[in-house]
Design a protein with these regions (language model features):
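Beta-strand-rich solenoidal segments
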Residues: 5-13, 50-143
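N-terminal "first-domain core" detector
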Residues: 1-60
Length: 143
């Protein structure tokens, strides 16, 4: 398995701890962010074609941890015909009861003559943290 995560509250007794209780033991010791001395700190690098690889690393956000223990290949969505855009490789922490997971994925930007970085979701139960931004020029077939 490449991406693992924790701590989340129990649902139907599938966990025996309260997530906030478990995670709070790290308050004052670990600050939110990517741990810079683990692997390549989730560094994003171009691969072949429209692929990028997210490097090995560990993160701590919103009382949850994420471990990426192998290169994680992601496919950048196909470029636009006329307009450019900026995509974001993000780590998403989703504590909604129906989800309870951390994921690494690409958020597609809005095509424009002068593109801007996509906005990150920051709500009470869902947060997105950018790992890298990728400029996708019109008509390209590789990053």
């Amino acid at each position: 398995m490449s991406v693992t995560y924790g701590f989340y509250n129990s649902k139907n007794k599938d966990r025996r701890y309260d997530a906030i209780q478990m995670s709070s033991i790290f308050d004052g010791i670990i600050r939110d962010g990517i741990l810079q001395h683990v692997g390549t700190a989730m560094m994003v690098k171009e691969s072949t074609g429209m692929m990028v690889n997210v490097g090995i690393g560990r993160a701590w956000f919103n009382h949850t941890w994420t471990l990426n223990d192998a290169l994680l290949p992601l496919t950048v969505p196909q470029s636009e015909v006329i307009l450019n855009r900026i995509d974001a490789v993000i780590l998403e922490v989703d504590s909604r009861e129906s989800v309870r997971a951390n994921t690494i994925k690409i958020v597609k930007g809005t095509p424009a003559t002068n593109p801007v970085k996509p906005s990150m979701i920051k709500t009470n139960d869902r947060w997105q943290y950018p790992l890298a931004y990728i400029r996708v020029n019109s008509g390209v077939t590789s990053i």
